[in-house]
Each structure stands twice: as structure tokens, then as C-alpha cells.
Amino acid sequence: MVLNRYSLITNCNHKTLGLYYLWFSFLFGSYGFLLSVILRTELYSSSLRIIAQENVNLYNMIFTIHGIIMIFFNIMPGLFGGFGNYFLPILCGSPELAYPRINSISLLLQPIAFVLVILSTAAEFGGGTGWTLYPPLSTSLMSLSPVAVDVIIFGLLVSGVASIMSSLNFITTVMHLRAKGLTLGILSVSTWSLIITSGMLLLTLPVLTGGVLMLLSDLHFNTLFFDPTFAGDPILYQHLFWFFGHPEVYILILPAFGVISHVISTNYCRNLFGNQSMILAMGCIAVLGSLVWVHHMYTTGLEVDTRAYFTSTTILISIPTGTKVFNWICTYMSSNFGMIHSSSLLSLLFICTFTFGGTTGVILGNAAIDVALHDTYYVIAHFHFVLSIGAIIGLFTTVSAFQDNFFGKNLRENSIVILWSMLFFVGVILTFLPMHFLGFNVMPRRIPDYPDALNGWNMICSIGSTMTLFGLLIFK
């Protein structure tokens, strides 16, 4: 597809906008990934290496921006925006999305939100709050620059508005513009993954918006929502944030489920094993995933009954998730199981890494274990296996499987693609697998220094990060 000079601001075609979402995703994701390479360069050995002692807040600023960019500006625009915009009307038999101009506006809001978040680095101390923006650190006028927190909040608000507009667009398209005779019961798994994701966004994003606006008013308008000195409660913000933050994980991964299901089904010319159960499993994941946000807060002093409920419900999510994994494997086994295309290989890698990441999530879901492993590198290893490896491989699978549609070129049989896949996979495994052992050795996250005894594992992690960088250069 040829994109002319002004098509970014004048085009309302869903395919063109989907391609722009993908380009923005890779552009923003490259920036976020390079920030993570800086972090791993700092952590390749104990003591401070490339960050000066008097400027150690730079480390906090880097991992804050890295987290926000990779979640809100890499995975979401790529999988939800790119895959959704390009394929949802096609899968519904609709000529176009319901509101093409609103779709165009939501795309144009993405770079604006990205620039706002990046501007926080230009403030005096930067926004070193972590991507969670916890008070009282984010509301303190003494330890940080409030301007940095302001622009991060505005960036998240703009990104949230764009996501809500896309969600309304997708749901309206499916409900009112699908082809005649195409009932909801026979829609594909990919379509349902986008519908459920849109519903979760509409449910949870207003709560995040309310939470960050309360932060903003605490900073500038003398409210005391989160100030315990005046009967405020910083734990309230954690509830508001994680009510969005945990469903956000499923918002990121559900479109990847749709992509993987579509790729496995089409590459092997097989119907998905248990097609309806796959849709039901995604619905169960969405409902249960919205009811377990407190498992991020086991160390905040919860009652025993509360911890028991959230532990059991968290572990319960493994049932529908396991259903999906077994159905994918059964679909593979009903075929000749050959690696027909690179997208088939990437799909298999996704299943392996997502299963491993989900298994460590079941371990962390146990309140007694999580108290010991909370805020250690075990947590980082867990969610990077699901997101950094799982969702990102889902994004690359999208590009690999549909490159004919996107670019009019077919590189599936190119050996460089297989080389890139293996180099990237080995790199990310080397990066994140040793972090489990660092977590068991109680290495705290968000700290740029650590004991000399942990040098070996950290060196392996940094080597893996460098391998991943070379793999991505090959992909480019």
C-alpha cells in the first residue's frame, strides 16, 4: 500500500490507519527498547557503571519512561490499534469502521501523547516515579519536578482518550456494521478478542483517568486525597490504579491471543480445536482478570480473608488460560506440525513463553509466596515473560503472517527471518530467565546497584539484552 505525504492527517481508510499504528508501534517501541538496553548496560556489573552517583535519579527516570512507552505506546498501538484497525472490518464483512474520522483522530493523538511523556525527561529531575506513579512520591513537590509528573499524566490521559475512541469504534462496528447473516455466535476468535479487549478498556480506563486526575489535583489544587497527614490514603490510589493496571495486562495480551489463533488456524488449514471454548475462555479471563487487582498489593496489610479470596481467584485464571494453551497445542497436533512459515515458528514460541510466564504468575498469585518475592526481580521476570516476550512475539507474528497484506512482500521463506526469530528468542530467554534466580536471591527491582555475589546472573542478562538488540537490527 502506497502512503502519500499527507495521508497521516488526511486518510480515514482503516487499512492505512492500521499500518500507521504499526509504524508508530515500532518507532515508539524502538525508543523504549533502547532505554532498556541502557538499564542492562548499567546493571551488567555491580556498583554504578554509566550513571553518576550524584545523578542516580536518571535510572529511575529511564525505567519509568521505558515502562510507560512499552505498555501504552508499543504493545497497545501495535496489537490493538494496528491489528484491530486493519482486520476487524475485514473479519466482520464491513467496508469500513463505524467512525472513520474518529479513528483518524485517535491515531493522531498517539504521537501527541508520546511526545508529552517524553517531555517529562526535560524537566529538572525527570519523572522517576515508576510507571505506576505511586503517591506520595509522585505528589511530593520536594523530591521530584511536578512538571514531569504533570506531562506524564497528560500523556496518559491523551492516550486513554485515543484508546476509548478506538474501543467505541470497534464495538459499534461489530454490533451494527457486520455482514448480514454473520451472527455473534459465528464470529472468529480474533474478532472476539478485539471485542472483549474493547469492553475491558471501556470498563477500566475511566478508573485510571479518575486516579491520575486525583493525583493532579493533589499536586496543584490543594486536595488531600492521598495525603495520610490529613486523613488521605495512598492505598486508595493503588486500588484505583491496579483496577486498571491488572486488566491492562489482559488488554495487551488478548489481541495477541487472537493473532496466534488466526495464524495457527490459517497456516495449517484447520479449524481451531474447541473454537467456542476459546471465546468463552477469553470472556472468563476478562471477567476474572477484572476481579483480582489486589494481588499487586499483598504487602499493604490486608486481612486474611481478603488475601485468601484474591489468591484463589488469581490462581483460578489459570483454568481458562490453560484451556487456550491446550486448544492451540491440539490444533497443532491435528496437523503435520511442520514449521510451514516463520509465523508458525513464532506462534509456537509464543505458546511456550506465555505458558512459562503464566506458570510463574500462579506462583506469585499465592499471597504467602508473593510477600517474599514482592518487588524483586522475580516479578520483573514474570511479567516480561508474558509481555516482553509473549506480547512482543505476538506483534512480530502479526507482521510475519500478514506481510503480504501490509507490504505486498513475502519474506516467509527467507532464512534471515528464521535466523532473526532464533536470535531474538535466545536473547530474550537469556535476558529474563536468570532474573528468576536473582529474584530468589532477593535482588530488589528499581535499584541500580546490587551485591557482588549476583554479578554472574546479571552479566548473563546483559549479554541476552545485547543479543536481542542485534536480533532486532536484523529484523529492521
Swiss-Prot record:
EC number of the protein: 7.1.1.9
GO cellular component: mitochondrial inner membrane; respiratory chain complex IV
Name of this chain's protein: Cytochrome c oxidase subunit 1
SUPFAM superfamilies per record: Cytochrome c oxidase subunit I-like
Chemical reaction(s) catalysed: 4 Fe(II)-[cytochrome c] + O2 + 8 H(+)(in) = 4 Fe(III)-[cytochrome c] + 2 H2O + 4 H(+)(out)
Species annotation: Plasmodium falciparum
Residues engaged in binding Mg(2+): 374-375
Keyword Transmembrane helix among record annotations: yes
